[in-house]
């Protein structure tokens, strides 16, 4: 809010959140509903430009996120094309051990595709109506996941700003993760929006739904995570990969996921927290203190 409306950042400056994510080495990300809260011109600015919609200059070049922002199910009403790139294909190197026990280095292509909740059309109607429209996550995935595979993706990771709901599927449903996991070709899901936890190790876990396995950390056999909210946890998906001599194959039965919380308890029962990263704190300290000063402003 502060960097969007109170003290708007210039085109040449990254959002503080993007600075932190850059320091952490994010490879890709998607958009949640709150990214649309400040209108499309501001979104265009903080993403670095390129949004071809009415009322926005797509040629405007700004600092941007610093990593590929992907979103497959929001389209420009003007162009009938995705508002931003629906997916990205990351080329990395895997260091593994061969059958002889020796270390080998092999290339791997990782497809990352993003989806947000169609609720943006209601919550930010004043900014979005007539300028963009949404598609169901399942429909978008069915369209674009095969494209990623055709371009050589060894694995496909779905970034879903949505969660789990056992209701019958609808293209407008807010939390379609249970249904998205059934789309062929998706190897892992990173979920959000509901501010819940998955997998949940509690005695009575949340998301106690058909097809959901908290012990394995899978949704319909697909490894998945939902890391609470506000940085309270880190979601970790561990995919078991096997090289068949020509390509990588995901062994889903041997894959798993987990959450690593920033807060735990020591032997005495006192709260223990992960140590803050001084590098990141220094990157955003000026804006952080300015925001604190603003929220302490008396209003009456």
Annotate each predicted stretch with a short phrase.
Residues 1-259:
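Acidic, metal/ion-coordinating pockets
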């Amino acid at each position: 809010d502060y960097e969007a409306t109170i003290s708007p950042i210039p085109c040449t400056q990254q959002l503080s959140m993007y600075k932190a994510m850059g320091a952490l080495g994010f490879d890709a990300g998607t958009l949640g509903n709150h990214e649309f809260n400040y209108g499309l011109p501001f979104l265009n600015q903080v993403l670095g430009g390129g949004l071809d919609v009415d009322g926005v200059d797509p040629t405007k070049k700004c600092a941007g996120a610093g990593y590929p922002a992907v979103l497959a199910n929001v389209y420009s009403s003007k162009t009938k094309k995705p508002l931003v790139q629906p997916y990205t294909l990351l080329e990395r190197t895997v260091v593994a051990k061969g059958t002889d026990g020796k270390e080998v280095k092999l290339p791997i292509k990782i497809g990352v595709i993003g989806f947000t909740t169609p609720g943006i059309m209601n919550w930010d109607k004043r900014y979005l109506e007539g300028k963009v429209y949404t598609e169901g996550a399942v429909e978008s995935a069915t369209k674009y996941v095969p494209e990623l595979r055709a371009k050589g993706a060894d694995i496909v990771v779905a970034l879903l700003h949505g969660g789990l709901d056992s209701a019958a599927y609808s293209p407008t449903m807010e939390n379609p993760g249970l249904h998205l996991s059934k789309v062929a070709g998706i190897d892992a899901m990173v979920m959000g929006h509901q501010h819940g936890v998955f997998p949940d190790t509690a005695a009575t876990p949340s998301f106690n739904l058909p097809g959901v396995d908290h012990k394995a950390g899978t949704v319909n056999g697909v490894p998945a995570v939902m890391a609470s909210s506000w940085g309270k946890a880190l979601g970790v998906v561990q995919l078991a990969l096997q090289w068949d001599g020509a390509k990588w194959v995901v062994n889903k039965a041997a894959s798993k996921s987990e959450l690593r919380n920033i807060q735990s308890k020591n032997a005495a029962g006192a709260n223990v927290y992960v140590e803050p990263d001084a590098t990141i704190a220094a990157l955003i300290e000026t804006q952080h203190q300015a925001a604190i000063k603003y929220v302490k402003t008396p209003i009456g």
